[in-house]
Amino acid sequence: MKVLVTALIISFSTAVLTVPVSIITAPLSVETIPGSSLDSTKVLGKLEAAYAQYGADSTSFKNSLQNIINAYMSIAADYEAQAGILEVRADIAEAAKNDVLATELEIKGDALEALAEGYTKTAEMLQEFLKLISEHEHKLSVVFREVKSGMIGTAAMESRLRPQATSSLPATGGQPSTGGKPTTGGQPTTGGQPSTGGQPSTGGQPTTGGQSITGGQPTTGGQPTTGGLPTTGGQPSTGGQPTTGGQPTTGGQPSTGGQPSTGGHQQLGVNQPEETPAPNRQLKMFRHYSKVCWQI
């Protein structure tokens, strides 16, 4: 409380408290002025007494504070009136060519005006403080706590008492914008929960790890051509019987361009293709087949 009230009057007390007491106690009815300076200890004493007496009773405390404000405004008015009287007397002394007296009266008048201004501004600051209490009666305990903790100035007080603006949720990283559920098969919503664990967006079941295309049934041609009867690579049966009655080459290319086999045995049950013979081997085989055909 002391810190608050000191802050309320500190901007005025410097000028007021430096007024020479001799000027205030000089003749010309100055002695009738209630008080000789802005006594900050009186301000503190009044507020502390009110706080100690009423505590958190906001109505009683506000009434006591208002009485202090009224008293200070009354004192300020008295000082202002006395300053006006001194100003008139200074003008009379100046007209009478009494420059020394005129100067003295002007100095006394300025001092009284400073006192009046000090009490007025102190009362205004207390009135602002009372306004804050009236606007935030439900937070009166906060006001007293801030005062005791050393918070000074009504502007700082008001910032503490003013309701804080409701903070909105952050645009990113907060709650998801739509339902918070993952989007099935789609991309995750920005700022929401990722769609990990949902169904993939293409193909339903993943192609990798499911049924393998490679090694399964071929997509064209029915049965695979590999492993069937070869259409090429075997030696044509030159000069023998036609290759009729053998296994058909299902799914393979037709055997075209081979020489008809006349006079030979049917080539039945050929299972695997032979390697293409080397030239020397072809010559030996040709001679062998020629001898066989000659013997027949």
Swiss-Prot record:
Its main location: secreted. Residues 157-280 are annotated as: Disordered. This is Glycine and tyrosine-rich protein. The keyword Signal applies. GO terms for cellular component: extracellular region. Component of the acid-insoluble and acid-soluble organic matrix of calcified layers of the shell (at protein level). It comes from Lottia gigantea (Giant owl limpet). Keywords: Secreted, Signal. Residues 1-18 form the signal peptide. Coiled coil: none annotated. It is found in: Secreted. Residues 172-264 have a biased composition (Low complexity).
